[in-house]
């Protein structure tokens, strides 16, 4: 019995060792089988897709649009703006960097395979039909090719294609500068089919008019503008070759006024104030007032020329032109006011205080000489007077009478003649000029800052 139990124990032990060895062998010896299986499966998929693509392109004619003679080809588009700006006022154009996406369905490229979507190389884009999209208001467009062409092509099993490319576009931006620099603009981006009319190819927005054009949060590259938003729509135009749909996206810009306040408005205001300082100078200070007038006029001329250098040569006056013109009028009026005051001063007695003082001294000396002569004449003939007349009575009376008659006249004339007198015109100008200039500024800024800009051909963003 003991031998039987021992034999059973040996058999169980051997069985356990066999199971353990088989487990270890399966773990270490056959661990490479799944990897080999995955690799084989991957190779099979590559072979399958290669055969699918070869089969799709076999007999494919990329000169013919999808659904030719059966249906209208619908191209869905959307735009992601990565960078907006700069904007050139002189050239009336702007630069924009976008990811331009187009999607359409081509039944000739339907396939069946282990994957529903194929990410393809951009080289395949030249072998299939793609929309002939062009930008109507584009001046120059660049397709980026570093390090490889920045294009993406995806094919779904039902034949739907997604074609994305990175573009940098310089487009026209018509500007109405009547309100410059408190102006706003809507820069359009227009694109559509070049050769296919609406009866063959039609464009639609992928996500509707609300979300089909998106601007990156840090995509603004503008120094003089605020990007307020964008609006999306469509237009239809009729030509001799048919009716075409134009996709439009308007980017709404509001100009920043700070630069122009510092560079133009404040210098103009200070120049006008400086020109009005001359009203507080004596009207006899001809050199000082002349320097004030001429210098301020030349300064305003320089400011008006420099302000126009940053603008295109438009045939109408802008808001800044009106402001500069009014400031120029105030400065020139101050110079004319001085000329008027100087003219009336010259016609009066004291246009030159120094010469007037010398003339007064000469006249005073002449009167003194006249008095002395009359006194000497009386003294010479005093012995012929009758004895009943006192000797000193008549001369004294005559002298006193003469001095009495001269002194009040001299005092009256001296009180009447003032050499540093203030003109009534200057007194009025000190009040009228600042009051008018302040009123003009109040009306000007209230009008232009509260005005809602009207942009033709575009709706304001909500």
From Swiss-Prot:
Q: Quote the PROSITE patterns the UniProt record gives.
A: NEUROTR_ION_CHANNEL (PS00236)
Question: Where on the tree of life does the source sit, at the highest rank?
Answer: Eukaryota
- Annotated spans, Disordered: 375-412
Any one Pfam family here would be Neur_chan_memb
Q: Which reaction does it catalyse?
A: chloride(in) = chloride(out)
Q: Where is the signal peptide?
A: 1-31
Glycosylation site list? 45, 145, 207, 236
Chain sites annotated for binding 4-aminobutanoate: 101, 164
Q: Which GO terms describe its cellular component?
A: chloride channel complex; dendrite membrane; GABA-A receptor complex; postsynapse; postsynaptic membrane
| Record keywords | Cell membrane, Chloride, Chloride channel, Disulfide bond, Glycoprotein, Ion channel, Ion transport, Isopeptide bond, Ligand-gated ion channel, Membrane, Postsynaptic cell membrane, Receptor, Signal, Synapse, Transmembrane, Transmembrane helix, Transport, Ubl conjugation
Where exactly is the Glycyl lysine isopeptide (Lys-Gly) (interchain with G-Cter in ubiquitin) cross-link placed along the chain?
A: 355
Q: Which cysteines are joined by disulfide bonds?
A: 173-187
Topology: which residues are Extracellular? 32-260
Q: Name one GO molecular function term.
A: GABA-A receptor activity
Q: How does the entry describe its membrane topology? A: Multi-pass membrane protein
Which is a GO BP term held by this UniProt record? chloride transmembrane transport
Entry's transmembrane regions: 261-281, 287-308, 319-340, 428-448
Biological function: Alpha subunit of the heteropentameric ligand-gated chloride channel gated by gamma-aminobutyric acid (GABA), a major inhibitory neurotransmitter in the brain. GABA-gated chloride channels, also named GABA(A) receptors (GABAAR), consist of five subunits arranged around a central pore and contain GABA active binding site(s) located at the alpha and beta subunit interface(s). When activated by GABA, GABAARs selectively allow the flow of chloride anions across the cell membrane down their electrochemical gradient.
Q: What is known of its domains?
A: GABAARs subunits share a common topological structure: a peptide sequence made up of a long extracellular N-terminal, four transmembrane domains, intracellular or cytoplasmic domain located between the third and the fourth transmembrane domains.
Instruction: Give the similarity note.
Output: Belongs to the ligand-gated ion channel (TC 1.A.9) family. Gamma-aminobutyric acid receptor (TC 1.A.9.5) subfamily. GABRA5 sub-subfamily.
Quaternary organization: Heteropentamer, formed by a combination of alpha (GABRA1-6), beta (GABRB1-3), gamma (GABRG1-3), delta (GABRD), epsilon (GABRE), rho (GABRR1-3), pi (GABRP) and theta (GABRQ) chains, each subunit exhibiting distinct physiological and pharmacological properties.
Can you say what this protein is called? Gamma-aminobutyric acid receptor subunit alpha-5
Organism phylogeny:
Eukaryota, Metazoa, Chordata, Craniata, Vertebrata
């Amino acid at each position: 019995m003991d031998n039987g139990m021992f034999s059973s124990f040996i058999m169980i032990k051997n069985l356990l060792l066999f199971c353990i060895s088989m487990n270890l062998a399966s773990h270490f010896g056959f661990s490479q089988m799944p990897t080999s299986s995955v690799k084989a499966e991957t190779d099979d998929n590559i072979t399958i897709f290669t055969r699918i693509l070869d089969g799709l392109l076999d007999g494919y004619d990329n000169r013919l649009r999808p659904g030719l003679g059966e249906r209208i080809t619908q191209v869905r588009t959307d735009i992601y703006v990565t960078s907006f700006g700069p904007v050139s006022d002189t050239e009336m154009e702007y630069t924009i960097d976008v990811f331009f996406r187009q999607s359409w369905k081509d039944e000739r490229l339907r396939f069946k395979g282990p994957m529903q979507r194929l990410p393809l190389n951009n080289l395949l884009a030249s072998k299939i039909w793609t929309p002939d999209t062009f930008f109507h208001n584009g001046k120059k467009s660049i397709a980026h090719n570093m390090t490889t062409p920045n294009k993406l092509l995806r094919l779904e099993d039902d034949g739907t294609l997604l074609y994305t490319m990175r573009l940098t576009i310089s487009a026209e931006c018509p500007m109405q500068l009547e309100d410059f620099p408190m102006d706003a603009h809507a820069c359009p981006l227009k694109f559509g089919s070049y050769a296919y009319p609406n009866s063959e190819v039609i464009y639609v927005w992928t996500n509707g008019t609300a979300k089909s054009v998106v601007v990156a949060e840090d995509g603004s590259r503008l120094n003089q503008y605020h990007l307020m938003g964008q609006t999306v729509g469509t237009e239809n135009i009729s030509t001799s070759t048919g009716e075409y749909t134009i996709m439009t996206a308007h980017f709404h810009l509001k100009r920043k006024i700070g630069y122009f306040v510092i560079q133009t408005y404040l210098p103009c205001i200070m120049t006008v104030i400086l020109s009005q300082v001359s009203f507080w100078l004596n009207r006899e200070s001809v050199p000082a007032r002349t320097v004030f007038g001429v210098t301020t006029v030349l300064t305003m001329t320089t400011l008006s020329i420099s302000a126009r250098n940053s603008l295109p040569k438009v045939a109408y006056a802008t808001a800044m032109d009106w402001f500069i013109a009014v400031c120029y009028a105030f400065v020139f009026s101050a110079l004319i006011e001085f000329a008027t005051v100087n003219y009336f001063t010259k016609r009066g007695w004291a246009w030159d205080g120094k010469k007037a003082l010398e003339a007064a001294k000469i006249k005073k000396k002449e009167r003194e000489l006249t008095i002395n002569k009359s006194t000497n004449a009386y003294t010479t003939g005093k012995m012929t007077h009758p004895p009943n007349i006192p000797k000193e009575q008549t001369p004294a009376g005559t002298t006193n009478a003469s001095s009495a008659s001269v002194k009040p006249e001299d005092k009256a004339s001296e009180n009447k003649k003032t050499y540093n007198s203030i003109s009534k015109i200057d007194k009025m100008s000190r009040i009228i000029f600042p009051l008018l200039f302040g009123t003009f500024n109040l009306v000007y800024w209230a009008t232009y800052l509260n005005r809602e800009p009207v942009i033709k051909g575009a709706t304001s963003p909500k």
